[in-house]
C-alpha cells in the first residue's frame, strides 16, 4: 500500500506541473528586465520603479483571485477540471505577454495578470489533488514534491533567461526572441498539463463527497492497484465516506438556519466556511497560525529577491545584465540543492 505505482507517478508528475509553473513565473520577469531589447522596447516600464513594481505585483493580484476561487471551483467542477482552467489561464497569459508591442506595454500587464490567475488556481488545487490521490502514509512526502517542482521552475527560469539573453547578441542587435522565449516556454508545461489532465483520474475524495461512491471506489482501486474488495481499499474508502458524512452533519449543526437547498449548495458551503474560520477561537487560532507562517515567510523578502535578483546583483557591482543573470542562475542552483537535500532527508526518514 505504501508504494507508488506507475499510474500514480504519472498523475503526481502531471499534477506537480502546476508547482513548476508557479516557480517558473517567479523567476522569468527579472531576467527580462535587464535584457537590452526589453529595455529598448519598454523604457516606460524599466525606467519607472512604480511601473516595474506594478508589472511584478499584478501577477500577485491575479494570484489572489485564482487562489480564492480555486476552492469553490475545485468543489463544484472537480480538482481535475479546475486545474485544466488554470492551464488555460497560464497559456493565455503567456501569449498575451509576448504579444506586447514596441512602446506599448499594456499586454505585458494583461499577460501577467492572467498568468497570476492561473498559478493562483494551481496553488490552491494542485497540492490538494496530489494529497487526495496519494497513499495516506506517503501523503506528506508527496505534497512536498509540489514545492520541489516550484524550485525546479525557479532555477530553470533563471538559466533559460541567461541562455536566451544571447539570442542576437547582448547589445543593440539583440532579438526580441531573447525576452519572449522564456515566456513562450512558460506556456509549454501548462499546455502539456492541459492535454495530460484528461488521462488523470478524478480525486476519489471528491467523487465520494459528490455521492459517486461506485466511481470513487473504482478510482481508489485503480490508484492503489488492489481489488475493490481488498481490506486496505475498503478501509480507505470508508474513512473518506465517514469524513464526508461528518462534514455534512457538522455543517448542518453549525448553520441550522440554512434551508436544505442552501445546505446542499457548494457555493453557500464554501462561503460559510470562510465565516466558520473566525466564528470560533479554536478555528481562528489554527488558521492564524498557518497564515502567519506564510506571512512571515513572504515578509522575509524571499519573493522580492527571486523577482528582482538580476537588479539586486547589478546594484552590488555586477555590471551588465549578463553577469547579473549568471549570478542569479547560481542562486537558483542554491535553491535547488537546499530543497533536494530536505526532500532526500524526508524520503530517508520515511524509508
Model feature map: region roles:
Residues 1-221, 249-351:
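Transmembrane-helix signature of 12-pass secondary carriers
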Residues 221-227:
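TPR/TPR-like (Sel1-like) alpha-helical repeat modules
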Residues 227-231, 251:
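Surface-exposed helix-capping loop/turn segments at secondary-structure junctions
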Residues 230-245, 327:
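Short, well-structured alpha-helical segments
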Amino acid at each position: 500500500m505504501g508504494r507508488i505505482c506507475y499510474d500514480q507517478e504519472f498523475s503526481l508528475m502531471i499534477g506537480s506541473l502546476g508547482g513548476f509553473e508557479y516557480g517558473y513565473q517567479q523567476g522569468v520577469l527579472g531576467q527580462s528586465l535587464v535584457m537590452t531589447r526589453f529595455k529598448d522596447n519598454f523604457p516606460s516600464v524599466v525606467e519607472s520603479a512604480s511601473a516595474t513594481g506594478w508589472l511584478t505585483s499584478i501577477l500577485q493580484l491575479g494570484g489572489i483571485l485564482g487562489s480564492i476561487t480555486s476552492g469553490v471551483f475545485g468543489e463544484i467542477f472537480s480538482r481535475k477540471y479546475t486545474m485544466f482552467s488554470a492551464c488555460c489561464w497560464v497559456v493565455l497569459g503567456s501569449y498575451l505577454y509576448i504579444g506586447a508591442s514596441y512602446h506599448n506595454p499594456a499586454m505585458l500587464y494583461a499577460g501577467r495578470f492572467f498568468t497570476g490567475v492561473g498559478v493562483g488556481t494551481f496553488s490552491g488545487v494542485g497540492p490538494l489533488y496530489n494529497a487526495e490521490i496519494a497513499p495516506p502514509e506517503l501523503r506528506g512526502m508527496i505534497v512536498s514534491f509540489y514545492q520541489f517542482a516550484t524550485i525546479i521552475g525557479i532555477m530553470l527560469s533563471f538559466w533559460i533567461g541567461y541562455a536566451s539573453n544571447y539570442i542576437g547578441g547582448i547589445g543593440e542587435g539583440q532579438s526580441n526572441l531573447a525576452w519572449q522565449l522564456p515566456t513562450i516556454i512558460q506556456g509549454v508545461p501548462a499546455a502539456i498539463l492541459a492535454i495530460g489532465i484528461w488521462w488523470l483520474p478524478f480525486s476519489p475524495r471528491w467523487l465520494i463527497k459528490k455521492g459517486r461512491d461506485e466511481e470513487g471506489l473504482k478510482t481508489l482501486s485503480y490508484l492503489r492497484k488492489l481489488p475493490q474488495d481488498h481490506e486496505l481499499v475498503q478501509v480507505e474508502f470508508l474513512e473518506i465516506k465517514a469524513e464526508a458524512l461528518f462534514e455534512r452533519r457538522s455543517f448542518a449543526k453549525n448553520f441550522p438556519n440554512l434551508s436544505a437547498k442552501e445546505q446542499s449548495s457548494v457555493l453557500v458551503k464554501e462561503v460559510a466556511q470562510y465565516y466558520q474560520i473566525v466564528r470560533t477561537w479554536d478555528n481562528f487560532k489554527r488558521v492564524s497560525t498557518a497564515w502567519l507562517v506564510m506571512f512571515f515567510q513572504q515578509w522575509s523578502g524571499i519573493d522580492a529577491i527571486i523577482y528582482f535578483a538580476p537588479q539586486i546583483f547589478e546594484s552590488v557591482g555586477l555590471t551588465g545584465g549578463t553577469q547579473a543573470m549568471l549570478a542569479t542562475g547560481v542562486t537558483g542552483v542554491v535553491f535547488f540543492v537546499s530543497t533536494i537535500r530536505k526532500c532526500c532527508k524526508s524520503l530517508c526518514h520515511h524509508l
